[in-house]
Amino acid sequence: MRGLFITLEGIEGSGKSTQIEMLYKRLKKDGFDVIITREPGGTPIGKEIRKLLLDPDNIMGAKAEFLLYAADRAQHVVELIKPALESGKVVLADRFIDSSIAYQGYGRGLDIDVVKTVNEWVIDGCWPDLTFVLDLDVEKGLERARGYSPDNQGDRLERELVTFHRRVRQAYHQLAEDRRFIMLDADRSREEIHREIYHKVKGCLIK
């Protein structure tokens, strides 16, 4: 029996990593066979790609960035996600295909159809069952995200202009019109957000 594939999406600093950790611990405590992963960087190859993508010293073209994310995702699906789902595990992923549509498609202005087509080929039918989008004001999210870095400047993407991140946020609003998505107000306490996510996920697991 196939497992359950859940992804968390959102702009920088929206709290995805915090929420996915909280959900992972709660589901483990409930006795579910669950794994947690992220993009980029969910595999050994992905970790190397992540370094290239997020290093603020790297000047990278939009197409090169897009293809590196696609390569990371291709390896991620084959090496980790598909095998885990086929063995019945619950897979929690911090970012997946929708990040490329939002960031490289809408954010960078690449052809949306190309971004979707390449990524649909890459994931080979491995679609998330449920995607949570943590929605937050861009300025507030960037302030949070940059505050986590040693120099308070953030990684290569976090240093992008506010207008870039506004396009990304708007993209998530458009994507969230699909029934697979649940958009949540991320400007609340982590406990309140967690309760809402956990309730939705538990409902899927006990069907």
From Swiss-Prot:
Among the entry's GO cellular component annotations, what is one?
cytosol
Q: Where is the signal peptide?
A: none
Disulfide bonds listed in the record: none
Q: Which InterPro entries does the protein's record reference?
A: P-loop_NTPase, Thymidylate_kin-like_dom, Thymidylate_kinase
Name the chemical reaction catalysed here: dTMP + ATP = dTDP + ADP
**E.C. number(s) listed in UniProt:** 2.7.4.9
Q: Where are the transmembrane segments?
A: none
Give the highest taxon in the source lineage.
Answer: Bacteria
Molecular function via GO: ATP binding; dTMP kinase activity
Q: Which UniProt keywords apply?
A: ATP-binding, Kinase, Nucleotide biosynthesis, Nucleotide-binding, Transferase
Q: Which GO terms fall under biological process for this protein?
A: dTDP biosynthetic process; dTTP biosynthetic process; dUDP biosynthetic process
Q: Which sites bind ATP?
A: G10, I11, E12, G13, S14, G15, K16, S17
Its job: Phosphorylation of dTMP to form dTDP in both de novo and salvage pathways of dTTP synthesis.
NCBIfam families reported for this sequence: DTMP_kinase
Family statement: Belongs to the thymidylate kinase family.
Query: Under what name is this protein listed?
Result: Thymidylate kinase
Q: Which organism is it from?
A: Halothermothrix orenii (strain H 168 / OCM 544 / DSM 9562)
The gene that this protein is the product of is tmk
